[in-house]
Regions:
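Structural signature of eukaryotic scaffold interfaces centered on beta-propeller domains
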Residues: 1, 39-43, 85-91, 136-149
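Beta-propeller domains
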Residues: 2-25
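Conserved beta-strand positions in repeat-built beta-propeller and related beta-rich domains
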Residues: 2-5, 14, 50-54, 97-101, ...
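Short loop/turn segments that connect beta-strands within beta-propeller blades
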Residues: 15-17, 62-66, 110-114, 167-171
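Blade-loop segments of beta-propeller domains
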Residues: 19-54, 74-79
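Beta-propeller fold detector
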Residues: 20-27, 69-78, 116-125, 130, ...
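Short glycine-/Asp-/Thr-/Trp-enriched loop segments that recur within the blades
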Residues: 29-36, 79-82, 125-138
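Asp-box/WD-like beta-propeller blade repeats and closely related beta-sheet repeat scaffolds
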Residues: 55-104, 124-125
Length: 181
């Protein structure tokens, strides 16, 4: 991922030789272009999902080392209720997307971009008024990762205030607080 690019947000390389295959995810305002690139996730060895928060969409790209090409296979437009989605994890049945309004901790979103359900709340040891939840959600922006083998979603706030472990298979949630949590 290239955030300081002039033309393309993504560059694919061979491994372990690191030979350039293709640049893709053209920067721009056109229908086939991207306004931004917040994150990406490998879908398979030759396919990635990429999030464009400004267009509120996730694109799936197929990459061919043989043809030196990247083709947009799918565009998933996110529902307007998913305001400013900045991260995601794909599971076998849905996307998991943090809620940056602070009403919930994250959303389960179907592969059409529609919310299925919201889960959890912002971890804090104090009961905070609802009017400050959006600010807290932005301040506690989390890094997220999902392990498809055991159904574990881990969320860690950027400054380490909390670590959350959601077991999506057993429907359990554990929160560990840091010194400023």
């Amino acid at each position: 991922m290239d955030l300081q690019n002039a033309d393309n947000y993504f560059h694919a390389f061979t491994y372990p030789n690191w030979k350039h295959i293709v640049s893709f995810g053209k920067r721009g305002e056109g229908p086939e272009e991207m306004l931004s690139a917040e994150t990406f996730q490998f879908n398979s060895l030759d396919s990635i999902y990429a999030l464009d928060a400004n267009k509120m969409q996730i694109s799936r790209w197929a990459i061919s080392a043989k043809d030196h090409s990247a083709t947009r296979q799918e565009v998933i437009r996110l529902d307007k209720n998913l305001i400013r989605s900045l991260d995601f994890c794909a599971t076998d049945s849905c996307f998991l997307i943090p809620d940056y309004l602070g009403e919930h901790r994250y959303w389960q979103v179907d592969y059409s971009g529609k919310p299925i359900r919201s889960i959890g709340k912002i971890p804090t040891e104090k009961d905070l008024a609802s009017e400050i939840r959006p600010a807290l959600a932005q301040a506690w922006r989390s890094f997220i990762d999902y392990n498809p083998h055991n159904g574990i979603l881990a969320m860690v706030t950027q400054l380490g205030e909390s670590i959350e472990i959601y077991n999506t298979k057993e429907n359990t949630h554990t929160v560990l607080y840091g010194p400023n949590g």
